[in-house]
């Protein structure tokens, strides 16, 4: 029994205390007489560490228990302790069994997982094997196709070679046949020629006699015809001369015929010039508001609207600086009053950078004054060569036939109105310039001359003498650019976005602030460049997927326009000085 030796005792056991500590080691047990033998440790006995104290204490406790009155209780307590230990051992055994069962379930789960992995791996291997077999089958099929294609190509090549050989044999046969036929033909022709020559040699006398008879007969026939014709003409002329009435009638008829032909020719020329001057348009005129018969027949509604339209404001749609606007308004008022009073028109020179509104103001000036306008370019004169003088006279003749008065606008006038003394110009262009100077030597109440140029310093001195007023159109400032941006933004973006069924839409942002910002960024740009910028906004919106013009799109197009303007200024600067009134790089 374990409780006799003090082992596995419960915490509440009575009569048994904790085991006594081990006795201390005797100091003489380690040393003694053996220490002097070379300091080697002495061999230990197997019972040297045995402590008999526990046995003694157990025997003592057993004796006390036998004489104690609690011996039975102690025995019961020992049995209960043994039962408790057995229950604990059974619970541990159950735990061990549960652990074993859990381990078995884990093993089963691991085996199932391993089986699943094995199945998936087998499936994957099977799929890979199937794919590999399919790949091999495809390769075999492709190889078969290639072999079949090579075989077909080889058969086709053999067939082509066979056809070529047959064609060569047929060609050789035909050539041989033609050669033999040619030889036979030559032999036949040679035989016929020999036979004909032999027959002609034998019949030479007969042939010469036939030729002689035919020539004599032809000579006799010709002589008789001449005698007969001379007799007839002589008798007719004698009869005509002797009859003075016939002579007089013939002379009068020929005279009337000559007069009619000459009159018809000149009348046709005069009528053609009249029709061309009244109804046609000169070749030098590129654009005109003057109504022609052909235009009235083609567009009757537009012509009627133009006839019924009232005079417009000369500066409508034209954005200029305040000082320039006041000056050109005075010119427009003076021109309108000149037309009303049927006085002489003044000639005007408008110079400045391109795209500043010179052509637009000329059109507005004509419409405001109730006049017709005609636009020609100086570059069209030089290619006409010798026809330039005639075309120039036709232009001014056509201008003098206008009942409402004509504003003749010459764009890029420096192209042909150059200095005659220093510039190297052709004789034809010099003659055309002289014709222009002749027709503009005096003021007219039929037409008004307006010249536009970027380089007015190249004009001939006689041209400068014919100009009454010079107007300088400069690049727009900050305020003018903002007005231009707002006007073109409204024309090309706002109106298409709010009117009609167009695809253009406009995103939500501050339009006024954006127009002011664009005007600030476009410093140095002309009105035409700002109009092109607005058109590019419209095109960008049309090119987008949803047709919406956003603020970012506008900024992108503005940056592109500014870069393009700077590039143009770099090119202009590279050309060197002497460009007249070209815009300076900003």
Curated annotation (Swiss-Prot):
Consequence when changing residue 411 to Q: No effect on homooligomerization. Immediate fragmentation of the mitochondrial network
InterPro entries associated with the record: AAA+_ATPase, ATAD3_N, ATPase_AAA_core, P-loop_NTPase
Binding site for ATP: 352-359
Residues where N-acetylserine is found: 2
Gene3D superfamilies hit by this protein: P-loop containing nucleotide triphosphate hydrolases
Residue segments, region S100B-binding: 290-305
Tissue: Overexpressed in lung adenocarcinomas (at protein level).
UniProt biased composition (Basic and acidic residues): 32-48, 111-125
Membrane disposition: Single-pass membrane protein
Mitochondrial matrix face residues: 265-586
Molecular function GO terms recorded: ATP binding; ATP hydrolysis activity; identical protein binding; protein serine/threonine kinase inhibitor activity
Key words, A-Z: Acetylation, ATP-binding, Coiled coil, Disease variant, Hydrolase, Membrane, Mitochondrion, Mitochondrion inner membrane, Mitochondrion nucleoid, Nucleotide-binding, Phosphoprotein, Transmembrane, Transmembrane helix
Cellular component, GO annotation: mitochondria-associated endoplasmic reticulum membrane contact site; mitochondrial inner membrane; mitochondrial nucleoid; mitochondrion
Region of interest: Required for interaction with the inner surface of the mitochondrial outer membrane: 2-50
Chemical reaction(s) catalysed: ATP + H2O = ADP + phosphate + H(+)
CDD domains per UniProt: RecA-like_ATAD3-like
Residues bearing PTM N6-acetyllysine: 491
Subunit structure comment from the entry: Can form homooligomers. Homodimer formation at the N-terminus may be regulated by ATP and is required for the interaction with the inner surface of the mitochondrial outer membrane and correct mitochondrial homeostasis. Interacts with components of the mitochondrial ribosome and with other proteins involved in mitochondrial RNA metabolism. May also interact with protein involved in lipid metabolism, including STARD9. May interact with FAM210A. Interacts with GADD45GIP1.
Free-text note on domains in this protein's UniProt record: The transmembrane domain and a C-terminal adjacent region contain all information necessary for mitochondrial targeting.
Associated disease: Harel-Yoon syndrome: A syndrome characterized by global developmental delay, hypotonia, intellectual disability, and axonal neuropathy. Some patients have optic atrophy and hypertrophic cardiomyopathy. HAYOS inheritance can be autosomal dominant or autosomal recessive.
Role of this protein: Essential for mitochondrial network organization, mitochondrial metabolism and cell growth at organism and cellular level. May play an important role in mitochondrial protein synthesis. May also participate in mitochondrial DNA replication. May bind to mitochondrial DNA D-loops and contribute to nucleoid stability. Required for enhanced channeling of cholesterol for hormone-dependent steroidogenesis. Involved in mitochondrial-mediated antiviral innate immunity.
Listed name of the protein: ATPase family AAA domain-containing protein 3A
Gene source species: Homo sapiens
């Amino acid at each position: 029994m374990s409780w006799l030796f003090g082992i596995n005792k419960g915490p509440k056991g009575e009569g048994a205390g904790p085991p006594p500590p081990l006795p201390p080691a005797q100091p003489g047990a380690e040393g003694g007489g053996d220490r002097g033998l070379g300091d080697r440790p002495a061999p230990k006995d197997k019972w040297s560490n045995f402590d008999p104290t526990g046995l003694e204490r157990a025997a003592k406790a057993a004796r006390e228990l036998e004489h104690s009155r609690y011996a039975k209780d102690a025995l019961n307590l020992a049995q209960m302790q043994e039962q408790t230990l057995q229950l604990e051992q059974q619970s541990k055994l159950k735990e061990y069994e549960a652990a074993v069962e859990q381990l078995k379930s884990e093993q089963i789960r691991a085996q199932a997982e391993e089986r699943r992995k094995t199945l998936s791996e087998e499936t994957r291997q099977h799929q890979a094997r199937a794919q590999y077999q399919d790949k091999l089958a495809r390769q075999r099929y492709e190889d078969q196709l290639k072999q079949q294609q090579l075989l077909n190509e080889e058969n086709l090549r053999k067939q082509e070679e066979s056809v070529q050989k047959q064609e060569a044999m047929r060609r050789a046969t035909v050539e041989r046949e033609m050669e033999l036929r040619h030889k036979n033909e030559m032999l036949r022709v040679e035989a016929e020629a020999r036979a004909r020559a032999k027959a002609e040699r034998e019949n030479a006398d007969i042939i010469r006699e036939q030729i002689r008879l035919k020539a004599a007969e032809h000579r006799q026939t010709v002589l008789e015809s001449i005698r007969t014709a001379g007799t007839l003409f002589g008798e007719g002329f004698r009869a005509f001369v002797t009859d003075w009435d016939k002579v007089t009638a013939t002379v009068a008829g020929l005279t009337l015929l000559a007069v009619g032909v000459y009159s018809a020719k000149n009348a046709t020329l005069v009528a053609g010039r009249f029709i061309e001057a009244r109804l046609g348009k000169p070749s030098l005129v590129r654009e005109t508001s003057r109504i022609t018969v052909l235009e009235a027949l083609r567009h009757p509604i537009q012509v009627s609207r133009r006839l019924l339209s009232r005079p417009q404001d000369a500066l409508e749609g034209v954005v200029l600086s305040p000082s320039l606007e006041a000056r050109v308004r005075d010119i427009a008022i003076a021109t309108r009053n000149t037309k009303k009073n049927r006085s002489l028109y003044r000639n005007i020179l408008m110079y400045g950078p391109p795209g500043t509104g010179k052509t637009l103001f000329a059109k507005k000036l004509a419409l405001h004054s109730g006049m017709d306008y005609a636009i020609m370019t100086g570059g069209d004169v030089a290619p006409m060569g010798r026809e330039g003088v005639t075309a120039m006279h036709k232009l001014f003749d056509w201008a003098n036939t206008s009942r409402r008065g004509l504003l003749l606008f010459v764009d890029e006038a420096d192209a042909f109105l150059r200095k005659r003394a220093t510039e190297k110009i052709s004789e034809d262009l010099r003659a055309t310039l002289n014709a222009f100077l002749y027709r503009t030597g005096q003021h007219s109440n039929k037409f008004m001359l307006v010249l536009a140029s970027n380089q007015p310093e190249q004009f001939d001195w006689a041209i400068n003498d014919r100009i009454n007023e010079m107007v300088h159109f400069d690049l727009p400032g900050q305020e003018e650019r903002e007005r231009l941006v707002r006007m073109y933004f409204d024309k090309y973006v706002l109106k298409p976005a709010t009117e009609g069924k167009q695809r253009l839409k406009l995103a939500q942002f501050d339009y006024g602030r954006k127009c002011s910002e664009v005007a600030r960024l476009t410093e140095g740009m002309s009105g035409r460049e700002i109009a092109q910028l607005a058109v590019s906004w419209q095109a960008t919106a049309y090119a987008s997927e949803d047709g919406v013009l956003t603020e970012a799109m506008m900024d992108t197009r503005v940056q592109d326009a500014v870069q393009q303007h700077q590039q143009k200024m770099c090119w202009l600067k590279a050309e060197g000085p002497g460009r007249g009134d070209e815009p300076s790089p900003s």
